[in-house]
Design a protein with these regions (language model features):
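Intrinsically disordered, low-complexity terminal tails and inter-domain linkers enriched
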Residues: 2-37
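Conserved AdoMet/S-adenosylmethionine-binding subsite of the radical SAM
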Residues: 35-198
Length: 199
């Protein structure tokens, strides 16, 4: 199975993004809906197009979210998710942006990843992992690696061992995600027993 250091539940990941102390850690936006005031704790930039394809606008939006005149969200509460846009990851490292980075990994070999993630054909796995290593070494931050479990595609014990080896030595956590079936993809969600064995 994947190494313990490279696995985390969604709740653990959320906890990692939401420190209760430290610089800015007690800040959080508040939104009002009717008579109830809600504290906005975390923001994840995901599912709205590839954030790193629109780097400058996304960073400007993050700056507004963080500003006291905006939503006053601490940077440690913001996660940016990418399919693996290598130039953007390297730019994040260069600019030392204090946010959390999540990478859609889903496979530990180039052939398997290219079959699941079209962007892997432009930015191969070895280039992606080199960029991730640079990011972690430069910023000192761990990366969250997203792994959507798909029956028969990436959910075997061999796949678990492969991702453990791929991430060995990196400050990493793997977030296992159940596949959400859609009409545009014929993959099947991993069965619960296989998911437990993968962990």
């Amino acid at each position: 199975s994947a190494s313990e250091s490279a696995s985390a539940s969604a709740s653990e990941r959320a906890s990692e993004r939401a420190p209760t102390s430290g610089p800015g850690g007690d800040r959080g936006a508040r939104t009002t809906a009717g008579p109830t005031t809600h504290r906005l704790r975390n923001i994840v930039l995901m599912g709205m197009g590839e954030p790193l394809h629109n780097y400058d606008a996304v960073m400007h939006a993050i700056d507004i979210l963080r500003d006291d005149a905006g939503l006053s969200i601490a940077a440690e509460r913001i996660t940016l998710s990418t399919v693996g846009v290598v130039p953007g990851i390297l730019r994040l490292a260069q600019e030392m942006r204090p946010l959390h980075l999540a990478v859609s990994l889903h496979a530990a070999t180039q052939a398997e990843r290219a079959a699941l993630v079209p962007a892997a054909k432009k930015w191969p796995l070895d280039e992606l992992m080199a960029a991730c290593r640079t990011y972690s070494e430069t910023t000192g931050r761990r990366i969250f690696y997203e792994w959507t479990l798909i029956e028969g595609k990436n959910d075997s014990a061999d796949h678990a061992r492969a991702v453990g080896q791929l991430l060995q030595g990196l400050p990493a956590q793997v977030n296992l995600i159940p596949l959400n079936p859609t009409s545009g993809y014929d993959g099947t969600p991993t069965r619960s027993e296989a998911a437990k064995n993968f962990q």
